[in-house]
Amino acid sequence: MFKEFKEFAMKGNVVDLAIGVIIGGAFGKIVTSVVNDIVMPPIGLLMGKMDFSNLFIDLSGKGYESLKAAKDAGAPVISYGAFINTVLDFVIVAFVIFLVIKQINRLKKEPVPAPPDTKECAFCCSAIPIKATRCPHCTSEQK
């Protein structure tokens, strides 16, 4: 059983998948930082010095000053600002993955089609081997 697991784990696809997951996790952290630290502050500034990560709806109706204060008090809140950041995070990751896949597909060479191995008999229209000098169906001589 251990031998089977070792063979499975050492297959190229499993190792490639593991590397992809690790790199993807690290890339996700970079994108989250880009969204939270670079993209959202200018957008917040344009919208009147708004910090999206602190946007929330207080479901208790007590009117907390900040999201942190509401969470510290245990009040039920909808943190829609964090949701906006997460959506932007996803859109950026999806767009970058799209660009990477598009470039990879552009660099792939189209496979050269194999030359035909059959031809059509000019007399009986049967498919015959390309090297045939006589048709096996009608026995006509081929050029």
Swiss-Prot record:
One Pfam family named in its UniProt record: MscL
Subcellular location: Cell inner membrane
GO MF annotations in UniProt: mechanosensitive monoatomic ion channel activity
Main location: membrane
Record field: transmembrane: 14-34, 81-101
NCBIfam families membership: mscL, PRK00567.1-4, PRK13952.1
UniProt-listed PANTHER family: LARGE-CONDUCTANCE MECHANOSENSITIVE CHANNEL, MECHANOSENSITIVE CHANNEL MSCL
Family label: Belongs to the MscL family.
Protein name as catalogued: Large-conductance mechanosensitive channel
Encoding gene per record: mscL
